[in-house]
Regions:
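Nucleic-acid endonuclease domains
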Residues: 1-50, 54-58, 62-221
Length: 221
């Protein structure tokens, strides 16, 4: 809760931003959030990190989303995934069967996935290296992508703990693995047939995250 208390302290300005819900042309979402919360936050130049904003004391990841919309949080090769989570080695070939050879996910992967659940979540949400996000910031837009409806801050540790209550399962399509209603992974696909289409892609639905004590500000004109 210390991180969320800090986030609450940042948001003294909810009445101050009378036009905060209006999209500003030319502004990336990260720049807009940095401007909104002030407190010396700046865009992180290291794009390899999952940290979008930092002030040297708190690190924030920003996700622009709509209600029930999936957002990519991580992607990479199966080899890369197994290199950072060695406990997945027993199912490496099965993951490659889906991602590289377009076969269906094999149910045999589930036991190993559940045994490595925390490592998978931390890999997808926090990344690696010294700089990791403390807070997930979600800006939710209307269906027309014209207006911000609200901005929400949640501690990353709470996001991870909320997802830990679920177990992995394979959807009926056999092409997507899910962990509860808001976290999935699959073969990326697309990319014009390039090799990157074989990446394993992790996604979340920010609006369906079941977290305790989020900081939510509804934005009005």
């Amino acid at each position: 809760m210390d991180i969320l208390t800090g986030a609450v302290n940042l948001l003294y300005l909810s009445q101050k931003r009378v036009n905060a819900s209006t999209a500003k042309r030319g502004y990336s979402e990260e720049k807009w959030v940095a401007s909104y919360i002030e407190n010396d936050f700046r865009v992180n130049d290291d794009r390899r990190s999952k940290v979008d904003l930092t002030n040297g004391h708190m690190n924030i990841q920003v996700k622009k989303s709509k209600a029930r919309q999936f957002q990519q949080i991580s992607r990479g090769t199966v080899d890369s995934l197994v290199s950072v989570i060695p406990n997945l080695q027993p199912i490496e070939s099965l993951l490659k069967e889906r991602c590289e050879h377009k076969k269906y996910f094999d149910p045999c992967i589930i036991e190993t996935l559940n045994a490595s659940k925390r490592e998978i979540l931390e890999h997808a949400l926090l990344g690696h290296g010294d700089l990791k996000p403390d807070v997930l910031c979600i800006t939710e837009w209307d269906k027309r992508d014209a207006t911000r409806k609200k901005i929400m801050f949640v501690a990353m540790k709470d996001v991870i703990e909320s997802l830990m209550q679920y177990d992995f399962s394979i959807r009926d399509s056999k092409t997507v693995v899910e962990l509860g209603p808001s976290f999935t992974f699959q073969r990326k696909g697309g990319d014009g047939g390039r090799k990157s289409a074989n990446d394993i892609q992790f996604k979340i639905v920010p609006s369906l995250l079941d977290v305790t004590y989020p900081v939510v500000i509804h934005l009005t004109h």
